[in-house]
Amino acid sequence: LTEARARAEAQAAAKRAKAGLRRGPLDGVPISWKDLFDTAGVATEAGSALLKGRVPGEDALVLKNATAAGTVCLGKTHMSELAFSGLGLNPVTETPPCVNDADAVPGGSSSGAAASVAFDLAPCGIGSDTGGSVRIPSAWNDLVGLKTTPGRLSLQGVVPLVASFDTVGPLCRTVEDAALMLGALEGSKPAALAG
């Protein structure tokens, strides 16, 4: 949980709303982020002891874009170690449960992003997909997962698995939410997000 940041961003969104200056449909919406997106001043370890203590100085570009759209960075989520497991397993940071069966694995590698949405902790989680890491946990947790075309969203500030295949994508409850989030991650202006 990025408590101080989340609180500050939520308060700023509330002030904008009160003043009639909302940035768009995602202004004030809390979003969870897979632990491979650089987050300024917050450990970004990709679920691995190998990267323990890695604290980036700036946000990943997709996080900057989402913040500019008014989203609230709720915190970082569990993931398969170094994004290398379609099951969502991680012996280093533990494995989150599957919403449909607490004894089942959630799918991965964006396991925590899926769990955060499936258990109603956030309306959207941001993950990465190289070989199914958004699609698998979305399917296993009754969510919508959007695997974007390689190159559509920036990988700047994203810990890579296979840079030529890696993509960034949202895990949400609805197709409409995924489409809105895609626009925010791209850096689209709010008007471009409307119908």
Question: How would you name each of these model-derived features?
Answer:
Residues E81-L82, G132-R135, T167-V168:
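Flexible loop/turn segments at secondary-structure boundaries
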Residues L1-T130:
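Gly/Ser-rich catalytic/binding loops embedded in alpha/beta enzyme cores
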Residues K147-G195:
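A short helix-breaking turn/cap at a secondary-structure junction
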Residues G88, T130-Q156:
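Glycine/threonine-rich beta-strand-loop-alpha-helix active-site module
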Residues V92, G108-S111, S138-N141, T148, ...:
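Short, solvent-exposed loop/turn segments at the edges of secondary structure
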Residues G57-L61, S111, N141, R173-E176, ...:
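Residues forming well-ordered secondary-structure scaffolds
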Residues R7, L143-G145, P170:
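Conserved hydrophobic/aromatic beta-strand scaffold that supports enzyme active sites
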